[in-house]
Amino acid sequence: MLLAGSSLLTLLDDIATLLDDISVMGKLAAKKTAGVLGDDLSLNAQQVSGVRANRELPVVWGVAKGSLINKVILVPLALIISAFIPWAITPLLMIGGAFLCFEGVEKVLHMLEARKHKEDPAQSQQRLEKLAAQDPLKFEKDKIKGAIRTDFILSAEIVAITLGIVAEAPLLNQVLVLSGIALVVTVGVYGLVGVIVKIDDLGYWLAEKSSALMQALGKGLLIIAPWLMKALSIVGTLAMFLVGGGIVVHGIAPLHHAIEHFAGQQSAVVAMILPTVLNLILGFIIGGIVVLGVKAVEKMRGQAH
């Protein structure tokens, strides 16, 4: 359940970021068409609703379709690997987990960099003009591909866990259970994502009702919606470290057992929380190591050229 919840938060964060980027793109395109490119891109709910509302569900549907394709690939692949090279499952999952940690650290560094070096109006205008020059459809497709890539790693973990549960069952049962879980998870997760990203539209709809109670509820949703998306972004990034760190830790048996043993010596409450906290911290450390490794490789390649 913890993995499923963390995976959902990671996906929500990815899609929330994706929708924000596409919202900026859409608003820029609209301003460009009008022959105006303003400085103010504070994408509040009212400004974004005309553009963003048209693309929210298509974007979620695009990622959901990619998620289904991921599972169509992963289910038979998992069965083949399990049958012929079962030892490869754990290393492959660990690579995926390390990649999630890497993405989490990249997000944190990007956020810190943005806070450290705030743009002046000229830099902001230059960046926005560069963004506006891009093809909106290609931009959207590229963003969706990134979300589908994250989904692939999380889907692989869910498929692997399910396969571990039904490993001793006949092949037909394994296929049916894996396919059923894959379908239910995809429909459930992206159905919930679709509801969450339409909260602001629900708020507008309720705010226009004649009932004072409905209007108050609608206004409340409009106030909550942007804060909810910000909270999801923070919690989703933490979930990347939690899921990714957990995958890597589980793949290193001595480390996993040491954490479990240490947690078992603590009080009941601490024993329940400690493994999660340690997975989170280790996830950040793992991500940091991968980022340093990637930057070192990029530096060497730059020197080679």
UniProtKB/Swiss-Prot annotation:
Q: How does it sit in the membrane?
A: Multi-pass membrane protein
Per the record, ranges on the Periplasmic side are: 173-176, 253-271
> For this UniProt entry, what's an example GO CC term?
plasma membrane
Q: Keywords of this protein's UniProt record, alphabetized?
A: Cell inner membrane, Cell membrane, Membrane, Transmembrane, Transmembrane helix
Topology: which residues are Cytoplasmic?
1-71, 114-151, 198-231, 293-305
Q: Where in the cell is it found?
A: Cell inner membrane
The answer, when asked if tRNA-binding is one of the entry's keywords, is: no
Q: Where are the transmembrane segments?
A: 72-92, 93-113, 152-172, 177-197, 232-252, 272-292
Q: Is Transmembrane given among the entry's keywords?
A: yes
Q: What is this protein called?
A: Inner membrane protein YedI
Query: Which gene specifies this protein's sequence?
Result: yedI
